Amino acid sequence: MNIEWISVSPGKVFIGSDNRSILFGGVGPRHEVKIDYDYEISYLPIDIEVAQEIIQSEDCFIASESEWTLAMENKLISGENEVEELSDKIRGSYWSKYCDGRPFIEENWIMKVCRTWKSGKPSISLIPRHESCNYLRLVRRNNKDNFNSSAPKLPDSSNKSRVLFEELLISLLFGIIPSFIWAHFNASPGYISEGWLNLVFGGLFIGVISATFWRPKTKSWRVGENCGKMKII
């Protein structure tokens, strides 16, 4: 098979979502990746059987999500109606990811990062571990020693205490307080003193359900210009 290889210059891209609502959110955190090396990427997705033969016989790799995104943002690659599998594999977040262009394979991963093409436009998609795609996107890296442990890296996990405080505050402001206000004007006398626990749990429930549609944007991360460490934007 004659593969068209496209050269990609070093650059920066943002990966991930800052929206953590259940319905509209994506995998987070949103973070910058700095790719310092040149590489070549296949212009089109390659049939998986052909791609596997090429990987075995040539110095090629499955493209990482970061490499794919940098090429896509520079309008260097294309597709038609394929679902292509990238080399990143996640459990549910990007925490602990090295942000230098290498593939991110999370411990105990359960989903494969993919791109779905429809009418020439790609969208982010995730498929379960046991499923496979019919296409891969390949890259050829000019330098085999691009990655090391001193590269910028996201923290191992989110600030759980901050997330918990945010959830409690949302439940208080949008669930519990409105429940008591409603009861004050509409419920029978004595209901608040006798049924306050129901109002609290009802407010908490409303707060939790609101996560389906909305949550405040999460912090994004960038690569520091001088220190080479990940910093909150």
Model-derived features: positions:
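Extended beta-strand/loop cores of jelly-roll/beta-sandwich
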Residues: M1-E73, P122-I233
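An exposed tryptophan-centered "aromatic clamp" motif
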Residues: L70-E106, Y191-S193
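Alpha-helix capping/hinge segments and adjacent helical runs
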Residues: S93-P128, N134-L136, R140
